[in-house]
Amino acid sequence: ASPDARVIFYMTWGHKYGNRKPVAEYPLSNGYEGMQERLKTSYLEMAYDNGAWCAPVGMAWRAVRSERPDCILYRPDCYHPAVPGSYLAANVIFTTILQRPYQTAFTAELPAEQAEYLQRTAQRTVLDNLVLLNIR
């Protein structure tokens, strides 16, 4: 293995309406915010405990949900990503790995303005939080 190799934990996003079937061993608040906060805390703890980085996909989803509630991140099942959600996640991963803004002309057939917004959100979420994400 390369001495420059890094383990990167992929912070997932909360379900659209939160955890609808809580289990005693893993208590979560019913809503999206509670589930997302628990996921964020857990992924960051794993990154710190293992000397790894964290790709904050869930944090980027939270930002988009807050700033652009009309952006459809979820498929109809309310768990899996629609194209904009996958596009956002991919941009978070690239920005995390590169540790610099990742820009591409590829839009996944999204409107150009939406693709640019998702790219900027991914960049901002990663680059404004390098210490929190254990990258620096």
Regions found by a protein language model. Give the residues of each.
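Long amphipathic alpha-helical segments with strong coiled-coil/leucine-zipper propensity
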Residues: 1, 13, 27-29
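A short helix->loop->beta-strand "cap" motif at the edges of active sites that frequently abuts
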Residues: 1-8, 52
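Active-site-proximal beta-strand/loop segments in catalytic clefts of secreted hydrolases
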Residues: 10-14, 57-60
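Catalytic His-Asp segment of secreted/periplasmic serine-dependent ester chemistry enzymes
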Residues: 20-22, 26-122
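Long, charge-rich low-complexity segments
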Residues: 123-136
